[in-house]
Swiss-Prot record:
Entry membrane topology: Single-pass membrane protein
Keywords noted in UniProt: Membrane, Transmembrane, Transmembrane helix, Transport, Viral movement protein
Main location: membrane
UniProt protein name: Putative movement protein p6.6
Places the protein is found: Membrane
Keyword Transmembrane helix in record: yes
Biological role stated in the UniProt entry: Cell-to-cell movement.
Transmembrane segments: 13-35
Biological processes, Gene Ontology terms: transport of virus in host, cell to cell
Length: 59
């Protein structure tokens, strides 16, 4: 019975704590690479595509 009472309060906190730790790790890694895994590559591809279209129009 005692072990059950000890585990009950901890259970709800473990999930959110793990999620927060994973998010912090992701942020640290993205900063160390100077690249946000999803946002930056998609932004660059769109930017280069627009540049390429503008160059074709100017020619």
């Amino acid at each position: 019975m005692a072990t059950g009472k000890c585990y009950c309060p901890e259970d709800p906190r473990v999930g959110p704590l793990l999620v927060l730790c994973l998010l912090l790790l992701l942020i640290l890694f993205s900063r160390s690479w100077n690249v946000a895994p999803v946002v930056v590559p998609s932004y660059h591809t769109v930017y280069h595509h627009e540049k390429y279209q503008n160059i074709e129009i100017q020619k």
